[in-house]
Amino acid sequence: MEDPNRMLAHTGGMMAPQGYGLSGQDDGQNAGSENEVRKQKDIGEILQQIMSISEQSLDEAQARKHTLNCHRMKPALFSVLCEIKEKTVLSIRNTQEEEPPDPQLMRLDNMLIAEGVAGPEKGGGGAAAASAAAASQGGSLSIDGADNAIEHSDYRAKLAQIRQIYHQELEKYEQACNEFTTHVMNLLREQSRTRPITPKEIERMVQIIHKKFSSIQMQLKQSTCEAVMILRSRFLDARRKRRNFSKQASEILNEYFYSHLSNPYPSEEAKEELARKCGITVSQVSNWFGNKRIRYKKNIGKAQEEANLYAAKKAAGASPYSMAGPPSGTTTPMMSPAPPQDSMGYPMGSGGYDQQQPYDNSMGGYDPNLHQDLSP
């Protein structure tokens, strides 16, 4: 019978390989897990380095670039990137098509050129002002040429101010666009030393940048066009308002009209005198009296109040705008001829003297009591 200690030792010797085999599997699993941990750690370090790029100083970034460019594996890295690019560039090659110009931007450009804001300054503002003045006058003569000249110069001055602001803002826009484009192009050229970037891709990126900036340019041109249209509308409205007679001219014409209600048809000599005093033409005087007679007949009540007002003014004192009144006789209802008068200046009725009244020169030949019962 053998010694148990020898058998134990022998058994231990036999069991040893089995125990060694199990520990080998455990060591392989541990080595694989260690590799995974190491890979994750490396990825984490790479991500940390990428995140720290934005915090690096310019000197540190230049040092890292120099280290990368001098690395012995840099050509291999560039070759791999070129292979990847050849595979991916085929899918995006067909998407790079030329886009037509924006029609809205073209319309804005044409409008700014027509208004004399864009393009070379060749009197475009003056031409626009002249056309606006002609459209506002509508074929009628201006009442005050000096005022029209002043307004015309104001329009051109404001249009020149709009033009100046537009060109200043456009210059700022173009400067910002050029600076940003130059920065991106330099950045892409710098990156082309590490990754493959073709000149066509750089040109494509420039086009994308200009398209982004075109929205700012469109807003600038749109606001400028709106400012020009507002200026034109205000100028045209002002021109239309100037077609009305001045207060002095209205006073002269109304005073003559109500002083001659018996025969509100001024002679050619009177029209010329009125036109001279009012600073208007004879045809405008004729048109005014024609319109005044129609308005008086349609609204006799309101016209009667206005007639009383002018009669009171004349009773208080002679107006500086007044002309010579009628030679004699009292007024009669509107649109009726004056009745015949005798040698004493009294109206003659069919049956002789009709309510003989002395002639009141203070009223200018007009008695408001005779027109209280007039019907339209």
Curated annotation (Swiss-Prot):
UniProt region (PBC-B), positions on chain: 127-237
Region (PBC-A): 45-124
Tissue: Prior to full germband retraction it is ubiquitously present, after germband retraction, mostly present in the anterior portion of the ventral nerve cord.
Family: Belongs to the TALE/PBX homeobox family.
Transmembrane segments: none
Gene3D superfamilies: Homeodomain-like
Compartments where found: Nucleus
Knockout consequences: Weak posterior-directed transformations in all 3 thoracic segments and in the anterior segments of the abdomen.
Assigned keywords, A-Z: Developmental protein, DNA-binding, Homeobox, Nucleus, Transcription, Transcription regulation
Domain (PBC): residue spans on this chain: 38-237
UniProt region (Disordered), positions on chain: 1-37, 318-376
Protein name: Homeobox protein extradenticle
InterPro entries per UniProt: HD, Homeobox_CS, Homeodomain-like_sf, KN_HD, PBX_PBC_dom, TALE_homeobox
Top-level taxonomy: Eukaryota, Metazoa, Ecdysozoa, Arthropoda, Hexapoda
